[in-house]
Amino acid sequence: MSEKAPFMVFSGTNSRYLAEKICASLNCPLGNMNITHFADGEFAVSYEESIRGAHVFLVQSTFPNSDNLMELLLMVDAAKRASAKSIVAVIPYFGWARQDRKDKPRVSIGAKLVADLLSVAGIDRLITMDLHADQIQGFFDIPVDHLYASAVFLPYIQSLKLEDLVIATPDVGGSKRASTFSKYLGVPLVLCNKSREKANEVASCLLYTSDAADD
């Protein structure tokens, strides 16, 4: 019987604290990786230990800037060239997720582009949390594990035993998630329907409320 392939966890510079907490929970060491920066702003990634035949988990959020995404892509490329058995990208915050559809002419769809870049780089699986839009999972031809923080948040909020608690969402896109919180906790829901004239500026806002018993 062949030996089970080992798993190894590595972190980019943007998510090292989380990776350390993950490794502590799994009782495994955080892998050694080196990121070399050059005078012109470029950087290169290298693994300081063998990952041949291992299941490699790469922890890195791709926000707030493009360097974090590029760093992850280089991590994936280096792992692929180092003969990892499989490569799993663990992206707690999936950047560019707000660009999930063509909502006006001549506009980019950043989430699809990021999905293509990760796939071409060579990931075999994606683990991410609370995507801005569920349909982003369909941008990938590989398995996507879409996790939800509600599994942690809901019991915690309930344990606080807060009075006059209301669940609110800043836009229609969050209504499904907010409704789940509202129903689970048995509290009212407030929905904000925003109107924008340009990005990052709200022209008007309508508030809708529902009682805890409403569906």
Where are these regions (language model features)?
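Residue-level marker of positions within ordered structural domains that often coincide
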Residues: 27, 214-215
